[in-house]
Amino acid sequence: MVMSAAMEAVRARIRDVPDFPQKGIVFKDITPVLADPTTFREVIDAFVARWKDERISKVVGIESRGFLFAAPLAYALGAGLTIARKPGKLPWETIREVYSLEYGENSLELHIDAVKAGERVLVVDDVLATGGTADAVGRLVTRQGATLVAYSFLVELGFLGGAKRLGREHVHALLSY
């Protein structure tokens, strides 16, 4: 796949941090992308270009870096914004979805009125790794009767199999490693 000059510039800003958060992991640090107004704008513009014709009515940002992309994307699309958070972080009634980690479990929550039946929902996060968190959010969306249009990410770590877990046809990533 040929990458645009804009996405090449974004890729060049992503910093590899070895052995973070633990030994053997190479963390993809997106903070330099966010710090540079040109590359941050390129990212948001690329998301908007992909989703502008899909009649998205709600964008769900996954805690916490997903919020950084979901908010400007929702604004640009004229869609509502809601957030999926860790348990106990949302102030009103919630629904919860548990997902498995390599060692144990975690969960995410949405307000019970965050998405409604018939809404067309896009789930957004910064990085797709194994797909566990995104899958949990997708289940929260569909449990409320909304249509899960797709998942969209800045970065996909293809070697971890997240797109396969979510269904490749439902996954969009601006950059893949």
From Swiss-Prot:
Return the GO cellular component terms, semicolon-separated. cytoplasm
What CDD domains does its record include?
Answer: PRTases_typeI
| Keywords from the UniProt entry | Cytoplasm, Glycosyltransferase, Purine salvage, Transferase
> Known InterPro entries for this protein?
Ade_phspho_trans, PRibTrfase_dom, PRTase-like, UPRTase/APRTase
Record's subcellular location = Cytoplasm
Q: In which pathway does it act?
A: Purine metabolism; AMP biosynthesis via salvage pathway; AMP from adenine: step 1/1
Q: What Gene Ontology biological process does one annotation of this record name?
A: AMP salvage
Q: What is its EC number?
A: 2.4.2.7
Signal peptide span per the entry?
none
Any GO molecular function: adenine phosphoribosyltransferase activity
The reactions it catalyses are: AMP + diphosphate = 5-phospho-alpha-D-ribose 1-diphosphate + adenine
Q: Does the keyword Phosphoprotein apply?
A: no
| Function as written in the Swiss-Prot or TrEMBL entry | Catalyzes a salvage reaction resulting in the formation of AMP, that is energically less costly than de novo synthesis.
Protein family according to the UniProt entry: Belongs to the purine/pyrimidine phosphoribosyltransferase family.
This protein's assembly is summarised as: Homodimer.
Protein name (Swiss-Prot/TrEMBL): Adenine phosphoribosyltransferase
